[in-house]
């Protein structure tokens, strides 16, 4: 079993163990039973054997301006490294505020206790009101890897492009009251570990915001949380995350299928711990939309090779349009699907 503690998500891969298991080897069983389900599965079946019937949204589909999303990505990358406690962290927060200056925006500021001491952090939440009682949350993290702070690591795919994508989605959401649920954009700070990934050294922003929303009752109003992470990769391959809510992942796959993009979704499965996890533990339906094959064997992730030339406008268009279609489907299907037998799996 390979568990990388230096990365910002725990990817549990067992290719060698599975080979030895096939040869009858019984070594290393201490951790294998807990992690075996996370090994990549080829030809995964993303939908249940009896796919649900989805109600049809009345409103026409919207489309993200992917060229604008790429321009926002360039501007965020130009800020430079954005690790927590850095000037770049402050600048990216100011950049987000500037892009959302005419919207309803709230800050969730806090001081995180980290292995490097106390570090000020802030989540930024933009709220777009809807006609229905309920909230759909779209999330992305805004920080870059802390251990790489002395390099020119800029996190083009890991942090920049999904922050940019949310800003481009905001351009589609603003203007008039939404016909369905309210949509909130959550820009999470402190996703990356400061020293080494652990329950206490990671996901600082999402853990803080989930706790706050649990305390004030917001959690109970959330119909679904769609997290975007590392999905600007030109070679797009979004995995099916086994820690996400099955019915919501099914709905995302339905959205992709309707748009002709299903070949980019869920060919493989894996278990990912990411900013959706604190909300899942509170009972929120979650889906982590993440491409964890960034370069051969994920070679570009958390390296200075995570640069703009690895991204594509097409991938941002696919990801953004599928998220918008998923919002449309959630507007008319969320309550019924959450009460279905699939929701208990």
What does each of the following model-derived ranges do?
Residues 21-24:
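C-terminal motif of bacterial Sec signal peptides marking the signal peptidase cleavage site
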Residues 56-63, 77-87, 110-115, 149-160, ...:
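Second-shell loop/turn segments in exported
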Residues 52, 60-63, 109-113, 224, ...:
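Active-site-adjacent substrate-binding region
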Residues 2-14:
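Bacterial N-terminal signal peptides that target proteins for export
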Residues 26-29:
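Bacterial signal peptide processing site
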Residues 71-131:
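A non-catalytic alpha/beta surface segment that caps or lines the substrate-entry region
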Residues 46-93, 296-307:
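N-terminal capping segment at the start of a domain
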Residues 153-255, 263, 268-271, 275-276:
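Acidic/histidine-rich catalytic neighborhood of metal-dependent amide-processing enzymes
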């Amino acid at each position: 079993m390979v568990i990388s503690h230096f990365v910002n998500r725990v990817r549990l891969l067992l290719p060698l163990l599975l080979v030895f298991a096939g040869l009858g080897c019984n070594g290393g069983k201490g951790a294998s039973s807990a992690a075996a389900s996370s090994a990549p599965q080829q030809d995964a079946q993303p939908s249940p054997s009896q796919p649900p019937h989805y109600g049809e949204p009345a409103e026409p589909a919207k489309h993200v301006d992917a060229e604008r999303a790429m321009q926002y990505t360039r501007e965020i990358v130009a800020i430079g490294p954005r690790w927590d406690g850095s000037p770049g962290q402050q600048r990216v927060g100011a950049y987000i505020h500037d892009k959302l200056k005419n919207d309803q925006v709230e800050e969730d500021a806090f001081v995180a206790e980290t292995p490097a001491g106390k570090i000020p952090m802030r989540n930024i939440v933009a709220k777009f009101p809807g006609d229905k009682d309920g909230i759909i949350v779209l999330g992305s993290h805004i920080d870059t890897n802390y251990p790489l702070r002395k390099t020119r690591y800029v996190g083009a795919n890991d942090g920049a492009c999904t922050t940019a994508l949310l800003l481009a989605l905001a351009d589609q959401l603003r203007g008039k009251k939404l016909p369905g649920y309210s949509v909130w954009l959550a820009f999470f700070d402190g996703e990356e570990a400061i020293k080494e990934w652990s329950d206490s050294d990671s996901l600082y922003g999402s853990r803080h915001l989930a706790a706050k929303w649990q305390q004030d009752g917001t959690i109970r109003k959330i119909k679904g949380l769609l997290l975007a992470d590392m999905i600007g990769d030109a070679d797009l391959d979004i995995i099916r995350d086994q820690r996400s809510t099955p019915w919501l992942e099914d709905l995302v796959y339905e959205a992709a299928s309707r748009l002709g993009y299903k070949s980019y979704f869920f060919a493989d499965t894996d278990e990912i711990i990411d900013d959706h996890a604190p909300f899942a533990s509170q009972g929120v339906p979650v889906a982590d939309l993440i491409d964890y094959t960034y370069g051969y064997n994920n070679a570009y992730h958390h390296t200075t090779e995570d640069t703009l030339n690895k991204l594509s406008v097409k991938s941002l268009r696919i990801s953004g349009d599928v998220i918008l279609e998923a919002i449309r489907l959630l507007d008319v299907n969320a309550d019924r699907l959450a009460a279905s037998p699939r929701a208990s799996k």
